[in-house]
UniProtKB/Swiss-Prot annotation:
Methylesterase shown to have methyl jasmonate (MeJA) esterase activity in vitro. This is Methylesterase 10. GO terms for molecular function: hydrolase activity, acting on ester bonds; methyl jasmonate esterase activity. It catalyses: methyl (-)-jasmonate + H2O = jasmonate + methanol + H(+). One of its GO terms (cellular component) is cytosol. Belongs to the AB hydrolase superfamily. Methylesterase family. It comes from Arabidopsis thaliana (Mouse-ear cress). The active site is at 96 (acyl-ester intermediate), 225 (charge relay system), 253 (charge relay system). The gene is MES10. One of its GO terms (biological process) is cellular response to hypoxia. Its EC number is 3.1.1.-. The keyword Manganese does not apply. Pathway: Plant hormone biosynthesis; Lipid metabolism; oxylipin biosynthesis. Coiled coil: none annotated.
Length: 275
C-alpha cells in the first residue's frame, strides 16, 4: 500500500470518528519539544498531532544567522501547510509569539484551517501590521520585566528588540514559574535565541480581512501568565475580538506543560465546534 493511500485511509477514518489534526506552533526560543505532554494526550484520544520546529528552533539545525528572514523562520510551517491535501483542514494552535506564525499561516492557507487557536498568543488585527502588536507588547511591560534575558537591538534602543534569548532567572521566575522542575530543566537545556522580525512584520498587507480576517479564531486566556500578562491578553482580545474566548485557571505561561489534561479537553471541544 502506498503512503498516499495510507494517508487517505487515515484521513477518512479521522473524519468518520470526528477526530482532528492539530498543528502546534511554538513561541520564541522554544521548539516542538514543549508540546510533548499535550501531544501525547491528544494522540491517546486518536487525534493526529504535528508539532512544528520553526527555523533555527528545536531540532532544526540552522543557526540564528541562517534564519534572518521571517520566510526562513516560518518555512517549516508553511511547507507543511502547503503539503496538506486541499480537502484537509487542520486545527492551528499558536502559543505566545507563535501567534504571529499562526496568523500568517491562516492568511496564506485560509481554506486549510478550520480554526486558529491563540494560546496566550499574539493575535494581530487584520487592519494593522503585526509589528504594531509587537511594539504594543513591549510598551506595556514594566521596567526590569525581562530580568536576565539577552536582547539585541539592531534598530536602536528606542525600538523593540531584534532578537531574544530567555535567561535562566526569567525562565524560573516567569515563563516556567508554574511548571515542574523537570520541565524547567528541559527548557534550560533546549532554549535557542530567536529573532522577533519586528521590521519585517511592519509590512502592509501581511494579513488581510479577506483571508486571515475571515477565519475562525479562539483565544485561550492563561491565568497567572507572567510572560504575556492577563492585562495584555485582554487588550489583544478587545483589540481584535475573536469568535470565542476560553480560560484556563492557574496555567501560567506554559499551559501545555502545567495543564495538559485541561488544555487537551479544551482543544478537542473547540475543534469539534468549529469542524
Amino acid at each position: 500500500m502506498t503512503y498516499q493511500k495510507q494517508y487517505q485511509m487515515q484521513t477518512h477514518h479521522m473524519q468518520q470518528q470526528q477526530l482532528h489534526h492539530f498543528v502546534f506552533v511554538h513561541g520564541s526560543c522554544h521548539g516542538a519539544w514543549c508540546w510533548f505532554k499535550l501531544a501525547a494526550k491528544l494522540k491517546l484520544d486518536g487525534h493526529r498531532v504535528t508539532a512544528i520546529d520553526l527555523g533555527g528552533s528545536g531540532v532544526d539545525t540552522r543557526q540564528l544567522h541562517e534564519v534572518r528572514l521571517v520566510s526562513a523562520y516560518l518555512e517549516p510551517l508553511m511547507s507543511f501547510m502547503e503539503s496538506l491535501p486541499e480537502n484537509e483542514k487542520v486545527v492551528l494552535v499558536g502559543h505566545s509569539y507563535g501567534g504571529i506564525g499562526t496568523s500568517l499561516a491562516m492568511e496564506r492557507f485560509p481554506t486549510k484551517v478550520s480554526v486558529g487557536i491563540f494560546l496566550s498568543a499574539y493575535m494581530p488585527h487584520h487592519d494593522s501590521p503585526p509589528a504594531v502588536l509587537i511594539q504594543e507588547y513591549f510598551t506595556r511591560l514594566p521596567e526590569g520585566f525581562a530580568m536576565d534575558c539577552e536582547f539585541t537591538f539592531e534598530e536602536g534602543l528606542e525600538h523593540p528588540p531584534s532578537s531574544v534569548l530567555f535567561g535562566t532567572s526569567f525562565l524560573k521566575e516567569k515563563a516556567y514559574s508554574n511548571c515542574q522542575l523537570e520541565d524547567l530543566e528541559l527548557a534550560m537545556a533546549l532554549m535557542k535565541p530567536s529573532w522577533l522580525y519586528t521590521k519585517e512584520m511592519g509590512g502592509e498587507d501581511l494579513i488581510t480581512k479577506e483571508r486571515y480576517g475571515s477565519g475562525k479564531r479562539v483565544f485561550i486566556v492563561c491565568e497567572g501568565d507572567n510572560v504575556v500578562p492577563e492585562e495584555i491578553q485582554k487588550w489583544m482580545i478587545s483589540n481584535y475580538e475573536p469568535h470565542e474566548v476560553k480560560r484556563i485557571e492557574e496555567a501560567g505561561h506554559m499551559a501545555m506543560l502545567t495543564k495538559p489534561h485541561e488544555l487537551s479537553q479544551l482543544l478537542q471541544e473547540i475543534a469539534a465546534k468549529y469542524n
